[in-house]
Regions:
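Predominantly soluble domains enriched in secretory-pathway, periplasmic, or organellar proteins
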Residues: 1-312
Length: 312
């Protein structure tokens, strides 16, 4: 049992999927160190926690399944029917169901986490990847990489209610905490579009310029917006930077240098830290959110892809 640090702060654990090693690294964010690593299915990518924090959900992409892992024992206890090549997913705010992007079949699969049954298969664009859900759970969003669209899906009917064209290869979708904005990154387009979910209009198209970094190396992927709506943090892939964006003015305020090919990112629940996965340098970066600076690099397995964080 880990003892909380002085001052009564909770200890958080980060779970990192290592795509090339077929493992998950567990990082104690009090010690800022990997405390254990365990084997999982083939090509692990998307990763999240169940609402109660008891289980890790993991896309084992080459096994065509979602694995359910006991967070205490690190053992796979069951699998969920995900459809082929699951890459990213999003869990309903209530904890059930799970919405899974199936890249090979151009579908979003809706899975009941408790009964392990497929509730629906929703046809979307070509190469679906990014998944988002509104805070009230009423709107599900999928991005299709080849169609270059954001698909808005009704929770009850599982029907697409709107399609929004964005820049090339949209990778990730993140609602703000108030549900009034949707941030969508476009990897090849090199941009991030902020969309009004109510009107489906693009509010702002954010571009990035980094001194001494070629434009084609700036490839936005993961994005997270702080709960207070003040800042967005965007992973810029081979540019090896996190863009810190003022979420009210949409201006880029700074770039934080992290590891190589930064891909995904996650806040600790208290938003003290932001953890980034850096695929080509086989590590994660720990960002002090208040100071907006990188304080630590931690070696993981090979090709760290996704990250999720919960209380220990």
């Amino acid at each position: 049992m880990l003892i909380a640090p002085l001052g009564g702060a909770e200890a958080y654990m980060a779970y990192v999927s290592n795509e090339k090693d077929n493992t998950v690294s567990v990082i104690d964010l009090d010690k800022l160190a990997v405390v254990r690593t365990y084997p999982v299915g083939q090509r692990p990518r998307g990763i999240t926690m169940t609402k109660d924090g008891k289980f890790v959900l993991l896309c084992a992409s080459d096994d065509d399944t979602v694995q359910v892992i006991d967070a205490k024992t690190d053992k796979v206890v069951r699998t969920l029917p995900s459809g082929p090549d699951p890459e990213l997913f999003v869990l309903h705010p209530s904890g059930n169901p799970l919405y899974v992007a199936n890249e090979d079949d151009n579908l979003v699969t809706v899975v009941d986490v408790e009964t392990e049954k497929v509730l629906a298969e929703i046809p979307v664009g070509v190469e679906p990847e990014g998944m988002g859900i509104s805070p009230d759970g009423k709107i599900i969003v999928n991005t299709s990489e080849t169609t270059n669209m954001v698909h808005f899906i009704d929770e009850k009917t599982h029907e697409i209610t709107a399609n929004v064209l964005v820049d090339s290869r949209p990778r990730f979708a993140e609602f703000t905490a108030d549900g009034k904005q949707l941030w969508v990154t476009s990897e090849v387009g090199g941009t991030t579009n902020v969309i009004d979910p109510a009107t489906h209009q693009i509010l702002k198209r954010i571009t990035f310029q980094i001194p001494n970094v070629q434009a084609e190396a700036i490839q936005p992927v993961g994005v997270r917006v702080s709960k207070d709506g003040k800042y967005a943090y965007i992973a810029l892939g081979p540019a090896n930077r996190i863009a810190v964006v003022n979420a009210r003015t949409f201006e880029v305020e700074k770039y934080l240098l992290v590891g190589q090919r930064v891909w995904q990112l996650a806040f600790t629940p208290d938003e003290k830290y932001l953890v980034t996965t850096n695929g080509n340098s086989n590590d994660v970066s720990i960002i002090d959110v208040a100071k907006q600076e990188v304080i630590k690099s931690i070696t993981t397995g090979r090709l760290p892809w996704g990250v999720t964080i919960s209380k220990d």
